[in-house]
Amino acid sequence: MAEVKCSSSTGSPTTNGLVANAELEVKKLQELVRKLEKQNEQLRNRASAVSNCTPSPHLLLQHPPSVVHQSGTCILSSPVLTRPAGLCLPSPVPTLLCTSAVAGSLFSPESMGCFSTNKRLHLSCINAAEGPQNDCPVPGSTLLDEVQVLDLEDGYCSGDEDTWLYVSPTKDQRTFDSSVSPLQWCRQVLDHPSPEIEAAKRSLCFRLEQGYTVKTSHLSPQSSVDSELSTSELEDDSISMGYKLQDLTDVQIMARLQEESLRQDFATTSTCSSVSRPRSSFSLYSGKKLSCSSDQDSDRYSVEEDDEDFDHLPPPQPRLSRCSPLQRGLSHSQTFSSIRDCRKSPSSQFLNGYQQYNYSSQPQTTEQSQSRTNADKLRRSMPNLARMPSTNNNPVVSMTTVRNSQSFDSNLHGAANGVSRMQSSIPSPGQLQQRVHSVGHFPVSVRPPLKATAYVSPTVQGGSGIPSSTSLQSLSSSGIPMPNKTTSAATIGRSALPRPALSTANGSSIPRSKIAQPQRSFLQPPKTLASLSTLRDGNWRDGCY
């Protein structure tokens, strides 16, 4: 600002010049003040506009250069934009872009929410007189109208529809005929396969054959038992023949193992299950034959199978070398049963029921008697080496007698024909008595004998008063009730070498050496009360429990 120098006006010419200059200076100062006032007013209006509207960053858009550099445009200067010469606002200011058409459609209060309807701000430019405000955007236009729209159909996907997919450069382009139906196309591929498909088919067939080979080799559970045979057959023969031979070998091995398991099961379970099977106890007392032959194939037969053999047809030739059934059953069973099994005396109730069971059996046939005679002839060649001096007419067998018969029988039969396994299938006398005792408490009609034509042994007879000795026959005639025993009993001592009696067709028996045999009949007379009381008081006193 120019300094105003006041001086005395004495009328001199210098004084008049100074007054004129002062007036000019005052005018300049007045104009400057007006400019400052206008500038302050604009600043106040601008500040109020900024305080009323705080736009979001997406509104800070830049106008096209043609609009920015027009004379009728009023903007808030920004460091980014180049300010034209006609703009009057200083820098720095906020980066809000606005024009004189703020009240219009550029920043519409309804859409932006910046201004209220009663407080619309009209920004005027300093150079308003130089050009009208027609340079501003047309009312009704928005910023979205200036956005360039991209045409997706033009330039991007206007070509082939498959061009945007990735195509390997090594893959050959095969043209697909759209006129061919999918079924025809599939048939074309199957009828004319490519080398890759042929190789895959061969590989699949090979793998399937390998899987079948492995599966069939492990089908038989017993293939590991005879592995050396199966492997040698597979090595020698082809694959298909190996399967057949292996299956045949497995069948044979399975048959042998089943046969062996049946023998072992019968040997282990016959004595255990005989307690609950009353019918087995009568097969011995009724004179049925028990399987105890010296040949090896008799081991696989049970007691019931022997009964069936001897009920319908005579015994085969290898079984003729059998001793008396009762003697053999008692002597064999003594090898594995202890004396403790024969302690308690059973009641007379089971004797009556047992006799009624025995009476229902029929007498033997002539054919069976002849076979029995042949067996007794063969039995005569085996002397009783365990013979000891006869004791008194005591019906109770002593402990020494039974033990001697045990040792003799086990040594004789164990070393001669090895039927130790079959001995376990014959129940002991203690178990027989126990079973008879358990059956005696049931009604007679509960379980009749299975075989009507039961074979009655002619040698299972003898009075209750026959003197007992250490021989095998002493056990058989020691007072156990027999089905065809008569009421009369002779008490005559035995000879040194006792022999089984030979029975004839008419029922008469040839007496053994120095032993008077009682008369036998095929009809079974009922027991008298005297014989029953003798048995109960004498021999059955030390019965089994």
UniProtKB/Swiss-Prot annotation:
Keywords, in A-Z order: Coiled coil, Cytoplasm, Cytoskeleton
InterPro entries associated with the record: Slain (IPR026179)
Coiled-coil region: 14-53
Compartment list: Cytoplasm, Cytoskeleton
GO CC annotations, alphabetized: cytoplasm; cytoskeleton
UniProt biased composition (Polar residues): 503-522
Compositionally biased residues, Low complexity: 268-286, 466-481
Superkingdom of the organism of origin: Eukaryota
Main location: cytoplasm
Positions of region (Disordered): 268-342, 461-526
Role this protein plays: Microtubule plus-end tracking protein that might be involved in the regulation of cytoplasmic microtubule dynamics, microtubule organization and microtubule elongation.
Family statement drawn from the similarity comment of this UniProt entry: Belongs to the SLAIN motif-containing family.
Protein's name according to its UniProt entry: SLAIN motif-containing protein 1
Species the sequence originates in: Xenopus tropicalis
